[in-house]
């Protein structure tokens, strides 16, 4: 997990908080989001409010799941959108678990079925 966002830790999971903040900033910098994989943890994000730097097409109340080992981020266009930005107003909570999560029947009912396509370039 990204340690700069980590707020709580147990032997089974960590909780990360994405809060409004300034980026590491320099006038000639581009605070670009980055690709990553959670090699040894499943990641669940709950989006509370604001614009998430690495994502597009989400809103308050959205939940995403990235199983261990699956590369993700950033969405197409987010590099370009980061140019000139000095901060973010994002608000989200992330849990990274060190054992695989099991998707419940209730979670399957709210799956939009197209999340995996959101990482592809739109033509």
Regions found by a protein language model. Give the residues of each.
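Anionic coordination/interaction segments
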Residues: 1-32, 106-122
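Glycine- and acidic-residue-biased ligand/ion/polar-headgroup-sensing regions
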Residues: 9-21, 29-63, 67-71
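TerminUS-proximal long segments
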Residues: 55-123
